[in-house]
């Protein structure tokens, strides 16, 4: 009987030891691994100083892994912002008093999207701004900021709490919103928001294949390299011609009016979004993107430049450049603020081309040809959309 009891005790002891070893291994597996290069003979392991040193080493190891995780999460966050149509989040912003922006849902194309829309020259469309703030949906006697593209209006405080204006930019927005120049709200300022999910997926895939990093500025070398890689997509033997490369360089200069040597990410994204819209959308689909204010702006330009129901092809070409000018010669009957917000520098390529366009841009043959109202709209719709952002950059440079 005694022998049987000793065997059972032995088994129980072995089981207890096995459980203890398993628990110890599990604890080591959960702890962050710390590589020890070897203990010196005079090591302080087991002392208070040794314990403090071990804790410090553990913190350093955890900090190293957290840095790697932060870098990878920052990259994922950049692609997520690009996918969702959001800009760079403000790093130093008091989020305790911030309004939560509504979830953005990308537009979808309807079945009749490619059918001609009914945009008549006459009668004129009435332009009436909303009465309530788009953020808080409250009407107050305070001055509201109207968007020059859509009919939305905003409170100064609401824009601050949403994080769309910060610091000194509030005074600039206030000045622009109540002048002829006008101001574009955060919906209209970002042309990328016009893309559908499928179009955005195509653009993101192109960026990834061409190794474009979101939220980073691009130099002329980066821009030309991207243009070459994008041209070779689907056809490795295809390359940009010398003329196309010069055109890309002129577009880069138009996107960099201040001659800083690089273009900002929002300007590059708007430019690429416009090119994708031009490539994938029919003209009728693009016309449906115009707001009532933009349609009235086009009517004013057509009536001011033509006589009756037609304008010369030369005037139609000049109109493509006029959307990017700070001031626009409106018709007397139009009371809508229609000018583009970005002034063109005197030394910029766009300014020099616009000054000499009457002499060199348009041949004499174009003066004798005429276009009607629908044709005028189709040839100007992309440049009207390109004039939406508040940036001074020209996001789609007209030919010439």
From Swiss-Prot:
| One Pfam family matching this protein | zf-RING_15
Q: Return the Gene3D superfamilies for the record.
A: Zinc/RING finger domain, C3HC4 (zinc finger) (3.30.40.10)
Q: Which residues form a coiled coil?
A: none
- Omega-N-methylarginine occurs at which residues? 36
Q: Does the keyword Zinc apply?
A: yes
User: Which residues are covalently lipidated (N-myristoyl glycine)?
Assistant: 2
State which gene encodes it.
PHF24
Report the residues modified as Phosphoserine: 43, 51
Q: Which Gene Ontology cellular component annotation is one that this UniProt entry carries?
A: cytoplasm
Name of the protein this chain belongs to: PHD finger protein 24
Zn finger spans (PHD-type): 129-190
Q: Where is the composition biased (Basic and acidic residues)?
A: 28-38, 78-97
**Organism source for this protein?**
Homo sapiens
- A GO term for molecular function: transcription corepressor activity
Q: What keywords is this UniProt entry annotated with?
A: Lipoprotein, Metal-binding, Methylation, Myristate, Phosphoprotein, Zinc, Zinc-finger
UniProt cross-references to InterPro entries, sorted A to Z:
EF-hand-dom_pair (IPR011992), KIAA1045_Zf_RING (IPR031946), Zinc_finger_PHD-type_CS (IPR019786), Znf_FYVE_PHD (IPR011011), Znf_RING/FYVE/PHD (IPR013083)
Q: Which residues carry this modification: Phosphothreonine?
A: 47
Renumbered to this chain, region (Disordered) spans 28-99
Q: Which biological process terms from the Gene Ontology are attached to this UniProt entry?
A: detection of mechanical stimulus involved in sensory perception of pain; gamma-aminobutyric acid signaling pathway; regulation of G protein-coupled receptor signaling pathway; regulation of synaptic transmission, GABAergic
